[in-house]
């Protein structure tokens, strides 16, 4: 994993603060602006979809249980079957919106989800 600050130069030599960006393959998340692009094209996500994608990308390779995601993203305690289905529906919609790149979100049967990427992973401005 490479970490790097990306700074924008302004007239007079002043710089803006580092832009925090997560990239995996063709997916890019600008954390300051809370926006996502795939192959450079903006993707409209709900707040929960954005938070799910960010959590999955930040913990790439780790299996995240439905219970963990419900607590982290929704603030719920013990998950019920209905709550667990909420995660499944949001993941399904997120995959659809990401198109072919949605295939990087893998289901781990009876547990949860994992973001798997076979490309170079870069995290800027940590």
Predicted regions located by residue number:
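Basic, amphipathic DNA-recognition helix from helix-turn-helix-like DNA-binding domains
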Residues: 1-24, 125-126
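Generic cytosolic/nucleocytoplasmic N-terminal low-complexity/intrinsically disordered segments
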Residues: 1-6, 47, 96, 109, ...
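Short linear sequence elements within intrinsically disordered, low-complexity coil regions
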Residues: 15, 55, 118-120
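Positively charged, aromatic-enriched patches within helix-turn-helix-type DNA-binding elements
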Residues: 35, 41-47, 51-89, 93-102, ...
